[in-house]
């Protein structure tokens, strides 16, 4: 894969398609999007644990707006399999290029960090690793097993890539029995060619459906960003597609443009529209909906897991 260094917006490795993309204007964020800069001592301690264990977090790599809040509460989402992705999605700030070899010691370091932070719930995600025969599935499983050995009471949520063209990869991850299996659709199907060109919408739907077929007790979850120019009825249809795959939990958040080289924000949706989506989603049968401008897949993941457990218990009581 040919890559270039984007010296204009950052010193990140970029796919040529992204680095050479014409600049687009970045809209001023509305007041409801703004967050406070992180300053707490707990934030610094969390940062120190991550660095000491030589780990990568999606909180930093993706430029999550909630990093200050989450790290101040000792919440962190670990990104395994390196910090270089094999794909170049138009919304994502993670570096693209040729990844390094898999770090065999990483599962133990992640488990050590989880134990040191005393996490009750942890989220494990990764870059896309199309270069690996199993897409990184076995490494996901090793991380899950390592955490179980050192933090038996910690619940584990995985946020996986689509494992496209990786036969039996999904089965490897599901066999490790994460408590929550998350795979994000990211956007409506009409936007895939521009926003998520390396993925296929209905492959992702089928992936989520297959998880439930293999192990019905694992909670399934998916999320999208809005603001790419999608229509409201497209979002409602996407909800129906997720429910047809028996997905339990959906997240909806506002897309925020990382740099001028990324897909522009077409529209900032006001908070009341997000509240409307949450009500509609509950009516469609999701056990839980998290929908707000600053909602992200891993935001409040531990609290959401407790809500999911209670909702399932009530449903079958």
UniProtKB/Swiss-Prot annotation:
Chain sites annotated for binding [4Fe-4S] cluster 1: 59, 64, 70, 298
EC number(s) recorded for this UniProt protein: 2.8.1.8
Main location as per UniProt: cytoplasm
Presence of keyword 4Fe-4S: yes
Transmembrane spans: none
Binding-site positions, [4Fe-4S] cluster 2: 85, 89, 92
InterPro entries assigned: Aldolase_TIM, Elp3/MiaA/NifB-like_rSAM, Lipoyl_synth, rSAM
Gene3D superfamilies: Aldolase class I
Cofactor: how bound: Binds 2 [4Fe-4S] clusters per subunit. One cluster is coordinated with 3 cysteines and an exchangeable S-adenosyl-L-methionine.
Substrates-to-products reaction catalysed: [[Fe-S] cluster scaffold protein carrying a second [4Fe-4S](2+) cluster] + N(6)-octanoyl-L-lysyl-[protein] + 2 oxidized [2Fe-2S]-[ferredoxin] + 2 S-adenosyl-L-methionine + 4 H(+) = [[Fe-S] cluster scaffold protein] + N(6)-[(R)-dihydrolipoyl]-L-lysyl-[protein] + 4 Fe(3+) + 2 hydrogen sulfide + 2 5'-deoxyadenosine + 2 L-methionine + 2 reduced [2Fe-2S]-[ferredoxin]
Source superkingdom: Bacteria
Family matches, as NCBIfam families: lipA, PRK05481.1, PRK12928.1
Xref: HAMAP family: Lipoyl_synth
Name of protein: Lipoyl synthase
Organism of this sequence: Bartonella bacilliformis (strain ATCC 35685 / KC583 / Herrer 020/F12,63)
